[in-house]
């Protein structure tokens, strides 16, 4: 199972790619595998503020609906509009095509609370 080393991870199975004071957020390969076939993704609007540990959207699969929890606080600067028409990208390419939001960080120190790839692998039993 892919757990890219350059990313950070939340305990709620979101991945975070850090690019200066902006982060890109998506869900992990492990999470999409647990959810099954993704049929709908609900994301916030551009310029919405999201708060660490609070829901900022949801992913619906044939089995269930799962909330997305913000690993950091900040302002949404971009959403992946392709997921509206192609939610299956979450299953096919969770780390590339299926990024969900880009967020301008409010507090970079929140990144210190996230897991490394090795810590995340340990958490999911890899």
UniProtKB/Swiss-Prot annotation:
Binding note for cofactor: Binds 1 lipoyl cofactor covalently.
Needed co-factor(s): (R)-lipoate
Gene3D superfamilies xref list: 2.40.50.100
Annotated Gene Ontology cellular component terms: cytosol; glycine cleavage complex
SUPFAM superfamilies linked: Single hybrid motif (SSF51230)
Keyword terms, alphabetized: Lipoyl
Oligomer and partners: The glycine cleavage system is composed of four proteins: P, T, L and H.
PANTHER family (alphabetical): GLYCINE CLEAVAGE SYSTEM H PROTEIN, GLYCINE CLEAVAGE SYSTEM H PROTEIN-RELATED
Similarity section: Belongs to the GcvH family.
Name this protein carries in UniProt: Glycine cleavage system H protein
Species of origin: Staphylococcus carnosus (strain TM300)
């Amino acid at each position: 199972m892919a757990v890219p080393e350059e990313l950070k991870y939340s305990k709620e199975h979101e991945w975070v790619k850090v690019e200066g004071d902006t982060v890109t957020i998506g869900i992990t390969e492990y999470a999409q595998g647990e959810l099954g076939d993704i049929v709908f993704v609900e994301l916030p609007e551009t310029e919405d503020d999201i708060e660490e540990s609070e829901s900022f959207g949801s992913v619906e699969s044939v089995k269930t609906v799962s909330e997305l929890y913000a690993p950091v606080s900040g302002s949404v600067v971009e959403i992946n509009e392709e997921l509206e028409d192609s939610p299956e990208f979450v299953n096919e390419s969770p780390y590339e095509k299926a990024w969900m939001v880009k967020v301008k960080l409010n507090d970079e120190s929140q990144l210190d609370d996230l897991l490394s790839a090795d810590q995340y692998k340990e958490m999911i039993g890899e």
